[in-house]
């Protein structure tokens, strides 16, 4: 059909004109079993295929009834390959008089961002340096060996054990960073190699599931700081962030003393996230989703760790060392990953364009050789969120271009000192707690 209406066109009808659709029609298809999305003005019915989406049905479903063009480009390297999967899902295209994006969006910003992405591709900033990532893996393995040699040569006393725990925690933190690079397919050109290497780093070196991490982390990138779409900020009723503070206050919900959440954060946030929450969530995901290969990889980590340290400590001592390492790395994980997000805007879906949504949810931390290494280059969070598949050693080169784009459109490009970024987490929690208390008492 050539007019505007519900499509009756079949993908196999080569040469036939595509049905034309309006945004009003597209918006009606954003239900759990009925989802359409728009990529490059073409409309796709992903209702059935979403369950087969490699990134998970939730990830692609978060873009239901939206223009997902920039997300499509951001998450995929080989677009010609991915388009083969889209073709059978094609049901129409936007009518000529329809805008490319639904709702009040800055068309000029969208065009400028896409021009920036093309310029970045022309500069070959999506090409990785194998030696850089080889050194990262090498220094992780070296720390694992060094920690064991320290106990082997000096014995399991308090001083060697403390030093070994610190070294292992640093190794675990750097493993988080490396598997994060691999999960974003930013090292190898072939996505399969990235995923295989990620399973090794995440499974054998850390004891976690690569599929579990990608499931939750890709959602964070698709919709950062959006409740019920970004798992990292969907933390109520334990902590109240952003708009949830007023909502809980008005509804007189008081499961915890939220006006003191900036204090109990130190007790249950940094110490326990990796040790308790991640361990339980990770195991549940592997069992429920039947990720048996990930389970074997994770089991190989625990087998290696226990076999390495039980001869020196016995079973209780080896488990205590494991807990110490997990608690130390958990502190690193919480502070480093949240310093860029918790102090920023957190709330419900605003349906912004890609660049605006990422910039509203992120900020940077002043770079230095140490901070770049220590944070896994997550101090360049703005650049990472705009270009998630970009190898991190290129963030410094693209940063001035992103900053210029923000200046042109009056967008915030915030860069903080490292310690200020850490303190702002506590300030933000305290502010949200006070907002909750005010709403609880007076609204």
UniProtKB/Swiss-Prot annotation:
Reaction it catalyzes: an N-acylsphing-4-enine + 2 Fe(II)-[cytochrome b5] + O2 + 2 H(+) = an N-acyl-sphinga-4E,14Z-dienine + 2 Fe(III)-[cytochrome b5] + 2 H2O; N-(hexanoyl)sphing-4-enine + 2 Fe(II)-[cytochrome b5] + O2 + 2 H(+) = N-hexanoyl-sphinga-4E,14Z-dienine + 2 Fe(III)-[cytochrome b5] + 2 H2O; sphing-4-enine + 2 Fe(II)-[cytochrome b5] + O2 + 2 H(+) = sphinga-4E,14Z-dienine + 2 Fe(III)-[cytochrome b5] + 2 H2O; (11E)-octadecenoyl-CoA + 2 Fe(II)-[cytochrome b5] + O2 + 2 H(+) = (11E,13Z)-octadecadienoyl-CoA + 2 Fe(III)-[cytochrome b5] + 2 H2O
Subcellular location: Endoplasmic reticulum membrane
Domain Cytochrome b5 heme-binding: 18-95
Keyword line: Electron transport, Endoplasmic reticulum, Fatty acid biosynthesis, Fatty acid metabolism, Lipid biosynthesis, Lipid metabolism, Membrane, Oxidoreductase, Transmembrane, Transmembrane helix, Transport
EC number: 1.14.19.-
GO molecular function annotation: oxidoreductase activity, acting on paired donors, with oxidation of a pair of donors resulting in the reduction of molecular oxygen to two molecules of water
Annotated metabolic or biological route of this protein: Lipid metabolism; polyunsaturated fatty acid biosynthesis; Lipid metabolism; sphingolipid metabolism
Domain of life where this protein originates: Eukaryota
A single cellular component GO annotation: endoplasmic reticulum membrane
Annotated Pfam families: Cyt-b5 (PF00173), FA_desaturase (PF00487)
Transmembrane segments: 131-151, 153-173, 260-280, 283-303, 305-325
Renumbered ranges of motif Histidine box-1: 180-184
Membrane protein topology class: Multi-pass membrane protein
Residues in compartment: Lumenal: 152, 281-282, 326-443
SMART domains on file: Cyt-b5 (SM01117)
Protein family: Belongs to the fatty acid desaturase type 1 family.
Name of this protein: Fatty acid desaturase 3
Naturally occurring in which organism (per UniProt): Bos taurus (Bovine)
Gene (name only): FADS3
């Amino acid at each position: 059909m050539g007019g505007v209406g519900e499509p009756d066109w079949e993908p196999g009808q080569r040469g036939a004109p595509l049905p034309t659709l309006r945004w009003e029609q597209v918006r009606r298809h954003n239900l759990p079993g009925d989802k359409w999305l728009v990529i490059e003005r073409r409309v796709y019915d992903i209702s059935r295929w979403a369950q087969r989406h490699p990134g998970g049905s939730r990830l692609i479903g978060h873009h239901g009834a939206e223009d997902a063009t920039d997300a499509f480009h951001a998450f995929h390297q080989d677009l010609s390959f991915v388009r083969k999967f889209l073709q059978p899902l094609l049901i129409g295209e936007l009518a000529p008089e329809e805008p490319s994006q639904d709702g009040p969006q800055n068309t000029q910003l969208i065009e400028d961002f896409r021009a920036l992405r093309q310029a970045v591709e022309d500069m070959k900033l999506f090409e990785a340096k194998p030696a850089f990532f080889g050194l990262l893996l090498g220094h992780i393995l070296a720390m694992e060996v060094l920690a064991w040699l320290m106990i082997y040569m000096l014995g399991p006393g308090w001083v060697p054990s403390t030093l070994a725990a610190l070294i292992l925690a640093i190794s675990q933190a750097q493993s988080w960073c490396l598997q994060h690079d691999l999960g974003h397919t930013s090292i190898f050109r072939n996505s399969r190699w990235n995923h295989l290497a990620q399973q090794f780093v995440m499974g054998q070196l850390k004891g976690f599931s690569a599929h579990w991490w990608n499931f939750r982390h890709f959602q964070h990138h698709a919709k950062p700081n959006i409740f019920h779409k970004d798992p990292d900020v969907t933390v109520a009723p334990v902590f109240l962030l952003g708009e949830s503070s007023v909502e809980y206050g008005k509804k007189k919900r008081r499961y915890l003393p939220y006006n003191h959440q900036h204090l109990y954060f130190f007790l249950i946030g940094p110490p326990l996230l990796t040790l308790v929450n991640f361990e339980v969530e990770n195991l549940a995901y592997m069992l429920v989703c039947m990720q048996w290969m990930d389970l074997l990889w994770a089991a190989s980590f625990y087998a290696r760790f226990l076999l390495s340290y039980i001869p020196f400590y016995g079973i209780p001592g080896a488990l205590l060392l494991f807990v110490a390492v997990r608690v130390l790395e958990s502190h690193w994980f919480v502070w480093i990953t949240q310093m860029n997000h918790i102090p920023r805007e957190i709330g419900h879906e605003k349906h912004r364009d890609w660049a605006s949504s990422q910039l509203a949810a992120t900020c940077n931390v002043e770079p230095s050789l140490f901070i770049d290494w220590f944070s896994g280059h997550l101090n360049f969070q703005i650049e990472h969120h705009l270009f998630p598949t970009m190898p991190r050693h290129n963030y410094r080169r693209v940063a001035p271009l992103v900053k210029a784009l923000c200046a042109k459109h009056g967008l915030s490009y915030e860069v903080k000192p490292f310690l200020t970024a850490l303190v702002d987490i506590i300030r933000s929690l305290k502010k949200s707690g006070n907002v909750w208390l005010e709403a609880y008492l007076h609204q």
